[in-house]
């Protein structure tokens, strides 16, 4: 977190993309972005990743170890890609909670899953990752896919996730990260800051939201930093896997 003070009584600031804003304003600004993109979020994911996001999520599911009867929390679950898969894995004796802080994203996810016939073992909860409204030691697995970078106090969110996991439970963080070679890094910069806003303008008439998303990726902790943050929060056996030359990384940690 970028915590800056102009005086002893000044409110701490944090980054919103490349801008510094008062901490109290970040959640509202992020909410505005996702209210704007919610209706076409799935379409834009497919266009901007060339469908690769489905492969990244599939790998996260394979590494989750989720099985019949488990209880899973899908934070920042958005339109429900992971929740739908987990619903099949846990079966009628398990439960999946799709949690999202953004009401528009939550509605899109609920409507989409209901249209697909996914309902019996899925619950939808509007929740803040920093203050999860669930009991201690409650879930076998917690996931957050492409959501942690939008959280103001990431350390608080990681500790909240640790609290709600059962001992031995797994946290999986799927997030954009730092490319592992210079050529990919340069290509990714050009793609992110030129193509992403352009596609946002053409498809959703909103280039600024996609410019923020590109900037938020650059401001997110890199692979090793996030690993250290998870260890500091209390997770054990923290590892990460780079995908697509580090464009995306999947971190996994275990609650002791």
UniProtKB/Swiss-Prot annotation:
Class of this enzyme: transferase
Keywords: Menaquinone biosynthesis, Methyltransferase, S-adenosyl-L-methionine, Transferase, Ubiquinone biosynthesis
Matches recorded under Gene3D superfamilies: Vaccinia Virus protein VP39
The protein's annotated pathway: Quinol/quinone metabolism; menaquinone biosynthesis; menaquinol from 1,4-dihydroxy-2-naphthoate: step 2/2; Cofactor biosynthesis; ubiquinone biosynthesis
Record's catalysed reaction(s): a 2-demethylmenaquinol + S-adenosyl-L-methionine = a menaquinol + S-adenosyl-L-homocysteine + H(+); a 2-methoxy-6-(all-trans-polyprenyl)benzene-1,4-diol + S-adenosyl-L-methionine = a 5-methoxy-2-methyl-3-(all-trans-polyprenyl)benzene-1,4-diol + S-adenosyl-L-homocysteine + H(+)
Enzyme Commission no: 2.1.1.163, 2.1.1.201
Biological process terms in GO annotation: aerobic respiration; menaquinone biosynthetic process; methylation
Binding site for S-adenosyl-L-methionine: 79, 100, 128-129
The keyword Transferase is assigned to this record: yes
MF (Gene Ontology): 2-methoxy-6-polyprenyl-1,4-benzoquinol methyltransferase activity; demethylmenaquinone methyltransferase activity
Family matches, as InterPro entries: SAM-dependent_MTases_sf, UbiE/COQ5_MeTrFase, UbiE/COQ5_MeTrFase_CS
Protein family according to the UniProt entry: Belongs to the class I-like SAM-binding methyltransferase superfamily. MenG/UbiE family.
NCBIfam families referenced in this protein's UniProt entry, alphabetically: MenG_MenH_UbiE (TIGR01934), PRK00216.1-1 (NF001240), PRK00216.1-5 (NF001244)
PANTHER family in the record: 2-METHOXY-6-POLYPRENYL-1,4-BENZOQUINOL METHYLASE, MITOCHONDRIAL, METHYLTRANSFERASE
Main function: Methyltransferase required for the conversion of demethylmenaquinol (DMKH2) to menaquinol (MKH2) and the conversion of 2-polyprenyl-6-methoxy-1,4-benzoquinol (DDMQH2) to 2-polyprenyl-3-methyl-6-methoxy-1,4-benzoquinol (DMQH2).
Identification of the protein by name: Ubiquinone/menaquinone biosynthesis C-methyltransferase UbiE
Provenance organism: Pseudomonas savastanoi pv. phaseolicola (strain 1448A / Race 6)
């Amino acid at each position: 977190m970028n915590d800056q003070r102009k005086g002893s009584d000044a409110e701490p600031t944090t980054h919103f993309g490349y801008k510094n804003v008062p901490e109290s304003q970040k959640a509202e600004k992020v909410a505005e972005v996702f209210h704007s993109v919610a209706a076409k979020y799935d379409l834009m994911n497919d266009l901007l990743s060339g469908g690769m996001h489905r492969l990244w999520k599939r790998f996260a599911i394979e590494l989750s170890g989720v099985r019949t009867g488990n209880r899973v929390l899908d934070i920042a679950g958005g339109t429900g890609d992971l929740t739908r898969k987990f619903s099949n894995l846990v079966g009628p004796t398990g439960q999946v909670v799709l949690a999202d802080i953004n009401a528009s994203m939550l509605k899109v996810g609920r409507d989409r899953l209901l249209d697909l016939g996914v309902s019996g073992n899925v619950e939808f909860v509007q929740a803040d990752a920093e203050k999860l409204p669930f009991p201690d030691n409650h879930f076998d697995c917690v996931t957050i896919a492409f959501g942690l970078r939008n959280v103001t106090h990431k350390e608080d969110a990681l500790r909240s996730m640790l609290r709600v996991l059962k001992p031995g439970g797994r946290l999986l963080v799927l997030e954009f990260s730092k490319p592992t070679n210079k050529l990919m890094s340069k290509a990714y910069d050009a793609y992110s800051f030129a193509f992403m806003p352009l596609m946002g303008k053409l498809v959703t008439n909103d280039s600024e939201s996609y410019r923020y998303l590109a900037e938020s990726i650059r401001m997110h902790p890199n692979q090793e930093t996030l690993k250290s943050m998870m260890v500091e929060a209390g997770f054990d056996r923290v590892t990460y896997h780079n995908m697509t030359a580090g464009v995306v990384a999947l971190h996994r940690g275990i609650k002791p």
